[in-house]
Amino acid sequence: MTKTSDFDDKVNYSGDYKGNYSNNYSGDYRDNYSSDYSATGYARLEKSLIDIVKEQQAKLGYRKEIVRLYYPLSTLRHFFECAGDDNKIAAGMISEQQMLEILAPNNLPKQLTDTIGEIKITAKNERFCIEIPPEGSEYVHENTADNEFISELIALVGTHGCTMEQITELFYKYSDDIEKKDMQNGEFDCYIRFLNEPDDTYYYCFHDEGCHIIYHRFLPQDYADFGF
């Protein structure tokens, strides 16, 4: 029997999107993106999926199993509406049904399916479930470099008595160029992010719950949407 794992982290926060969009967009979505795969929305999605699976495997260990990840439509829009200078899709235009079309099996590029596998997509109320097959989990485990920073961060916040000073020192271990700011939104105490690490642009948001510190990480566009 194939095992499954559901992973719904705050990086995939399912908040409300406040923009307006048209349901009448027509055209071949694939024509809107650069011929350079790395500049496409599909490549952005692939990187996000791999990042989250890596984080999950660092937290829970590796198992060759189905993994289900959850994204709000607003996050997926950011991937496909910010995919190069030749992009013709205006911000906020892509509807839930249109996103399902973009992510339909016949539209997925080979570069994506060769790595993460034949993903399956469902959606309800602008919340998308992306099901990664066991082969995708295996690919991430066997063919991508370990994220040593994430592994160390997860181990550190799981340690009794962990402090923000220790967490800040860990960031400095990997880069001298970081930004740390207090947050006063009732949910998080501060964020830390790397300023010149193109492969890690996340906002790492931390909250001290007294007995331990928790974190969630957000893509920059999502962080801006939430208005923290």
Model features per residue range: what roles?
Residues 36-69, 79, 152-155:
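Positively charged, polyanion-binding regions of nucleic-acid-associated proteins
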Residues 105-143, 186-197, 213-214:
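Charged low-complexity interaction tracts in eukaryotic proteins
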Residues 198-228:
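Intrinsically disordered, low-complexity regulatory segments enriched in Ser/Thr/Pro
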Residues 67, 77-118, 188-191:
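Charge-enriched amphipathic alpha-helical scaffolds
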Residues 163, 169-204:
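A cross-family detector of function-defining hotspots
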Residues 12-34:
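Long, intrinsically disordered low-complexity tandem-repeat segments
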Residues 5-8, 12, 146-162:
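N-terminal trafficking/processing presequences and adjacent post-cleavage segments
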Residues 95-104, 160-176:
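Amphipathic alpha-helical segments
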